[in-house]
Amino acid sequence: MAIGDRAMFTVLLLFIASISGFSVVRCVTDPSDVQALQVLYTSLNSPSQLTNWKNGGGDPCGESWKGITCEGSAVVTIDISDLGVSGTLGYLLSDLKSLRKLDVSGNSIHDTLPYQLPPNLTSLNLARNNLSGNLPYSISAMGSLSYMNVSGNSLTMSIGDIFADHKSLATLDLSHNNFSGDLPSSLSTVSTLSVLYVQNNQLTGSIDVLSGLPLKTLNVANNHFNGSIPKELSSIQTLIYDGNSFDNVPASPQPERPGKKETPSGSKKPKIGSEEKSSDSGKGLSGGVVTGIVFGSLFVAGIIALVLYLCLHKKKRKVRGSTRASQRSLPLSGTPEVQEQRVKSVASVADLKSSPAEKVTVDRVMKNGSISRIRSPITASQYTVSSLQVATNSFSQENIIGEGSLGRVYRAEFPNGKIMAIKKIDNAALSLQEEDNFLEAVSNMSRLRHPNIVPLAGYCTEHGQRLLVYEYVGNGNLDDTLHTNDDRSMNLTWNARVKVALGTAKALEYLHEVCLPSIVHRNFKSANILLDEELNPHLSDSGLAALTPNTERQVSTQVVGSFGYSAPEFALSGIYTVKSDVYTFGVVMLELLTGRKPLDSSRTRAEQSLVRWATPQLHDIDALSKMVDPSLNGMYPAKSLSRFADIIALCIQPEPEFRPPMSEVVQQLVRLVQRASVVKRRSSDDTGFSYRTPEHEHVDISF
């Protein structure tokens, strides 16, 4: 018996030990999650409220970081609501691949939303902060969202057509912001939406897109909506619509006691077509009470109307003043239509009350009438010259990995093993004004956050130097990959080429249409598209155009190395806009299609200019097949090739006004990717390019 007990005890100890060992292993948090949380903690100014959080190291799952919930080694919930933290959301939230719930509501978080958010969220709550800018396009890919709340911020511009793929969204709260424009048409496709709050914005147009939704609660109060309220909305349990200009505002039924449940903002109106039931419906109200309620309501309504009139009158005066100031500070580049849009957008932003900690750029009008720009805080790290000298071996020739119009780029290895890329700007390339504006440009570049843009990590201004520190992307650039005679071009399959085109298109879309004011790249070329190990593209030199001289003579000197990419309007007048970037993007797409350089003096005269040679052939199926890069070995789908050529033709049109915006280019490339599947094509001397191949030759390796 004793032996049996001892054996049983031994087995029990082994079981406990195994369980303990398992729990220890389970507590080791995924390294990418740890890094993302560390960046978030630093971006929030390392607040003491986040107990157990660390700037470096640590184990969020094993050490019970405040607000963090894990499943195994993955972080699935971040709930740091109502803790009074401030700062920004950082730039690595998208690395939290397993995160399902993010709640940072009720804090003082400011700045713009990160362009990339955790992709698999089911619940997103950013309410009651000081967030500005617009909703990032990446929300369109977050198809698992069932709850989204960004209310009580300072978000601006249009909401964006970002809900087409949201098949689970039940609650959407965009209220108490400064959104403008019409409701996005993609809202009509959200068949699961039951609660929608958009009150207290600057929205316009009709609400017809909501007519087919299964809404139970809808609040559109205090906007600029017009037209008719669709009769389909009569089944909504709670409808709040006052403060607009609807044509068919229904008459109110007999006064009744308000229910216990209150909805956010706006006065509650009975639902259209039927009466609301009071919880005490069996108890009648006397005539005197009804009369008192009516007169009391009229008195309160009169006071509210007077207050609203005074507020609106004051607001209009502020908007007029801020619009005039904003117009003076806008860049002169771009079409008149773009400039007009910027005036409207900046005016609406200027009217908002920003917290002192917000990173905004303000134009101060001096007594002499000039404008002094107050620079935003710089989010990038500041380096010393000595540390950069050590990391680059005193900027030795062996460390040079590139050279551009503003200076050379060096590979830098720091003592901790971190590898970075250092751009050493040649001060001779800058005028005095550009030197003075260097820190302002650094501030703007440090805030660019996009997965396809090389991030600025730091800078140095010691001893008159101008040095920029970038994240290192170590797999070369697209120019070398396409145009050098080695195995790298063989690895660039058709799918990879479309992937590069889509990624860089999204980067330009971000610069042109997400950033405010728009950022013109002005040096977009294959040599500035860096590739990582998975052939994801990363656009370099974004924002550097602010440092280049502004005169036509100087600009021509700066981009002489990019000849072959230049848009016709730039060659004629020196004018460069976002539409010029679209043109150069089309040239890069031609490189991806043909494998040829934009200018190649080794070819016959008729084929030296890629654009001139290729343009007449883009809509000729037979000619198109002969243009394709031979290194693809016929491995591409014919329809995808044709659509790719159609996009190129749009981008390289001679007239800039006919070129599409980058958002349209992105949409077309996304559709191309969705339809794409690689089909092996055969080419022979007798039949030429084969657009029909036997069934056994189909290879399904679509995106």
Swiss-Prot record:
Give the LRR repeat ranges: 96-120, 122-142, 143-165, 166-190, 192-212, 213-233, 234-256
Which intervals lie on the Cytoplasmic side per UniProt?
313-703
- Give compartment(s): Membrane
The signal peptide annotation in the UniProt record is 1-27
The Gene Ontology CC terms held by the record are: plasma membrane
Q: What is its main location?
A: membrane
Give the glycosylated residues.
Answer: N120, N130, N149, N178, N226
Protein kinase domain segment(s): 395-672
> Which chain regions cross the lipid bilayer?
292-312
Statement: the UniProt record of this protein carries the keyword Ribosomal protein = no
Q: Which family does it belong to?
A: Belongs to the protein kinase superfamily. Ser/Thr protein kinase family.
Name-wise, this protein is: Protein STRUBBELIG-RECEPTOR FAMILY 8
**Source organism of the structure:** Arabidopsis thaliana (Mouse-ear cress)
Q: What lineage is this protein's organism placed in? A: Eukaryota, Viridiplantae, Streptophyta, Embryophyta, Tracheophyta
Identify the coding gene. SRF8
